[in-house]
Amino acid sequence: METDQKKRPTGMTILLVLSFINACWNIFSSMVMFMATPKLAEMAQNGEVENLMAPFTATMSEEMRESMLAGMNMIAQIDTKYWLFLGILFIGSLMGVIRMFKGDKRGLHIYAISQILILINASFYLYPHQPQSSFVSDLLLTAIFVLLYYLYFKRMEMQNNEPQTPELP
């Protein structure tokens, strides 16, 4: 259902801009990681990750350095298909955001489906390497954005269905 673009609430515009930035950033970073992960995995296997990270970790505490190296080694273990699927799914998310920006409620469906598939993708490839709290926070953030978009579209529909009072000359 098309809605009047002029009546889009400011809060929805802010959410759309944030979602647009998030989708663009994730498309870019997913493609970079898709290309870089094989080399990173090779470096992790050869024990070269610590040398690679040395300039960045030199001023860190031992605990922070170990945590960062563990994170890099974890990233090296993630299948490259995860990054490919993630990039494709964020393209879908971006398409949904663009449609919503134009006032098309179908964009909400595209966005929501893409975000759910992103969570499913991460469940197979990413979350097994991370604490459960990561899944919960991602799920909550996704649910909040989808719910807010839904509520804004409902509000816009109600505003568009209100009887118009004729203007006096």
Regions found by a protein language model. Name each.
Residues 2-169:
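Topology signature of small-to-medium multi-pass alpha-helical membrane proteins
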